[in-house]
Amino acid sequence: MSVTISAASADDAEHILKLQYLCYQSEAELYGDYSIEPLTQSLDDLKAEIARGHALVARLGDEVVASVRGEVDETGTARIGKLIVHPRLQGHGLGGRLLDAIEQHFARDTGPAAKRFRLFTGHRSDGNLRLYRRKGYETVGTERINPRLTVVTLEKAA
């Protein structure tokens, strides 16, 4: 069975939220903070986020096994976030495929065209940082949130 990538709909929201909760457990453990937004986001908030921007899901058969979402702001910055891959499928290139797919969407979107892609992750999230740098992202800033977490912002031209 192969993995297919398609646009997410409101009907996918519950599956995405469950996957998000599963995937962000390791991030919460890494930073010692289980109150992070991906673990506290409500279903209604997720549905609104999907409606406001663009979201993709990857399916293995009928199962949602990965997702990413984002939106383009008024300056032409495509803010990409919550790139998640089911733990059993991590390390097989699915995250990179999803990142490529959402970048392609924003580069040709009928709305405001993306001039740049921006995303962020925690400073200890080595796998995320490796993926983003391999995909051409460069660090453009850091912000210390608390003693355990510094957020790294990465960007690349569209």
Could you say what each language-model-derived stretch is?
Residues Y132, Y137:
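Conserved active-site tyrosine of GNAT-family acetyltransferases
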Residues G93:
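Glycine-rich phosphate-binding loop
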Residues K115, E138:
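Short acidic/polar active-site loop segments enriched in Thr and Asp
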Residues A10-A13, L17-R88, G96-G111, H123, ...:
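Acetyl-CoA-dependent GNAT
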Residues R118-L129, I145-L149:
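Conserved beta-strand-loop-alpha-helix junction that forms the acyl-donor binding cleft
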Residues M1-T4, A158:
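Short, low-complexity, intrinsically disordered N-terminal peptides in bacterial proteins
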